[in-house]
């Protein structure tokens, strides 16, 4: 197409990719927290969906009912990962202008 500078678009795409990758590195240092069972299980994840810590209140531990604790841990982990995903999507949308870039955003 006459008048279209493809090199310009490629440079812009590369800059956008660099900004997104830089922001992802920053997100790795950020934390989100989720709780389950009235706060008896707390999970902290970073901004790139890695679990950083799991804390379990003593009251949540019942040797006769391990399935309840398993359910609380599962719920808290899933909530932390969902919160982390949403946080990452919001932050990357700020950079990409809301455009979904496969494999990046």
From Swiss-Prot:
It is found in: Cytoplasm, Nucleoid. InterPro entries: YbaB-like_sf, YbaB/EbfC. One of its GO terms (cellular component) is bacterial nucleoid. GO terms for molecular function: DNA binding. Keywords: Cytoplasm, DNA-binding. The keyword rRNA processing does not apply. Disulfide bonds: none annotated. Homodimer. NCBIfam families: DNA_YbaB_EbfC (TIGR00103). Belongs to the YbaB/EbfC family. Binds to DNA and alters its conformation. May be involved in regulation of gene expression, nucleoid organization and DNA protection. This is Nucleoid-associated protein MXAN_1931. It comes from Myxococcus xanthus (strain DK1622). The lineage of its organism: Bacteria, Pseudomonadati, Myxococcota, Myxococcia, Myxococcales.
């Amino acid at each position: 197409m006459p008048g279209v500078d493809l090199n310009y678009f490629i440079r812009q795409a590369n800059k956008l990719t660099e900004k997104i990758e830089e922001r992802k590195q920053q997100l790795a240092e950020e934390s989100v927290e989720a709780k389950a069972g009235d706060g008896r299980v707390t999970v902290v994840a970073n901004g790139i969906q890695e679990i950083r810590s799991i804390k379990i209140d003593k009251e949540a531990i019942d040797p006769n009912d391990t399935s309840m604790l398993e359910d609380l841990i599962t719920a808290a982990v899933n909530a932390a990962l969902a919160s982390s995903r949403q946080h990452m999507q919001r932050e990357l949308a700020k950079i990409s202008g809301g455009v979904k870039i496969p494999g990046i955003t």
